[in-house]
Amino acid sequence: IDMLEETYLKIISSKTAALFAASTKVGAILSESESREKDALDFYGKNIGLTFQIADDTLDYNSEIKFFGKEVGKDFFEGKITLPIILLCQKINSSEKEKIFSFFKQTNRSNYDLTFTLNLIKKYNIINECYKKADHFINLASNSLSIFENSEQKTILKNLTSFSLERNF
């Protein structure tokens, strides 16, 4: 469970972010856009993908929005190490860390284990920390669109940047 944030970002870059990047770049390729436009849309898609995945992983630990359809704790029960757990382990004291590590060493985690973890996430303000990280990628995505002239398409892409972080499902 001692995963670095950098390792986590590499993993989601090669999965979700790569899919988003391919999806945004293909339009530029098909329309025979300039190389710099293809690169900008590739960069945009990658950063939207990173934002989307961080938001999705954060939703798993946000008990405030469990009624939106995403089961709180799913990643936890599957033993997935995601950004909320990584950031939590950077902030907690040694006895709390020992307890969290013990949860992830087990094959089965209990509701008590999840509740304990959620309480620490709340105590250390980890949800906000995750959204700050995601916001960084939103800004990168949004800034990559600056090479394009104002248009309806650009407005749609800019709106998508906000949606990727603000979604609750």
Which residues does each PLM region occupy?
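All-alpha prenyltransferase/terpene-synthase fold signal
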Residues: 1-169
